[in-house]
C-alpha cells in the first residue's frame, strides 16, 4: 500500500467514532482530507462540523457539510486529526500545515481526540520532524533567539502566513524527551502564540495504519 492509501485507511476507520446527531471536530491535513471525504457519505447523520482551518472549512463546505462556529458549541464529543509525529505517550508534533493554533483550540474543547496516521508517524522520541511555532510577526527575531537558546535551529517558513495572520518558525534539531516541559517552555516565550507540541492535551485514541491493517491504541489512564 502507498502512504496515501494508509492515510485513507486510518481516516476511514475514524468514521466509527462519529455518532448520530454529533458535532464533529475536524483537523487539517492530507489524512484529514480523506476523513472529510468519508464524512460526506454520512453527513445526513450529523449536526455539522467545527473546523480547525480555512482549508478544511472549504473542503467541508464543498461536500455540503454544515460548518459551526466553535464559540456556539459548548462541547465537542470527538476531534479527528492527524499528526506529524506521535510518541508512545500519545504526545504529538502537529502543525506541519500551519494550522496548529486552531487545531489546539478545537482539541482542547473535545472530549476525545482521535489521531489518525500511518505507521511512519509513530516515533520513540519526538523532534525529527521540525517543530512549528506560531509567532506574532514583530516578535520573529526575539523568538528565534530564544529558540536557539533552547538548543533548536530555528528557520522562518518563508512566504507563509497562518489563518490568524501570523508567522511560522520551524525548530530543527530537537530531541524532545519531555514534551510537556518543552511545550510549556516554548509557550512561555513572549511573542509565541503556541507551538506544535500537543503534550498537555495529547491524543486519547490512535488509529495507526500499516500494510497489516488499522490498529487501535488507547492512551493509558495512568
UniProtKB/Swiss-Prot annotation:
The keyword Oxidoreductase does not apply. One of its GO terms (cellular component) is cytosol. Substrate binds at residues 28-31, 81-84, 94-97, 121. One of its GO terms (molecular function) is ribose-5-phosphate isomerase activity. GO terms for biological process: D-ribose metabolic process; pentose-phosphate shunt, non-oxidative branch. It comes from the Bacteria. Pathway: Carbohydrate degradation; pentose phosphate pathway; D-ribose 5-phosphate from D-ribulose 5-phosphate (non-oxidative stage): step 1/1. It catalyses: aldehydo-D-ribose 5-phosphate = D-ribulose 5-phosphate. It is an enzyme of class 5 (isomerase). Belongs to the ribose 5-phosphate isomerase family. Homodimer. This is Ribose-5-phosphate isomerase A. It comes from Azoarcus sp. (strain BH72). The gene is rpiA.
